Amino acid sequence: MKIIYMDSKSHDEHISYVSHLSHVTSFMLAKTVIEKEKNEKNIFDMAGSGFESTVRLAKSSPKMWAPIFLQNKTNLVKALDNYIKNLNDLKSKIENDNKNSILIDLNNINRIKKILGGIKNNNEK
């Protein structure tokens, strides 16, 4: 990790995407599954490592995160709007059996592997 200097407004905007949105996503995925799967044992028995790693942030302190969400709500709401737009776009492609478009999107998005790999490589230096 590298120290990045920026003004507080820029900080709050960027952090709403790379930190706060991750927590919202994790909490809401956990909520969605808990509401659907009334039998908690089913969640435990059926969930794989992907689900566990995706909801890891939902195990964070609600007392800490609720105020953070509200304190940065203007930026977080914008981030959520962008995220929901992307979810709706994917939903539409799934509904319309648009496999080619889904594959193109997923391949483009998959470059996050390289981006995060750079983070790991920079930490090793």
Model-found features: residue ranges?
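Interdomain hinge/lid region at the active-site interface
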Residues: 42-109
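Long, positively charged, glycine-interspersed low-complexity recognition regions
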Residues: 114-125
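Generic structural signal for well-ordered, non-transmembrane alpha-helical segments
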Residues: 4, 19, 23, 81, ...
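Amphipathic alpha-helical interaction surfaces
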Residues: 24-27, 60, 93, 115
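Internal alpha-helical scaffold of NAD(P)-dependent oxidoreductase catalytic cores
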Residues: 1-56
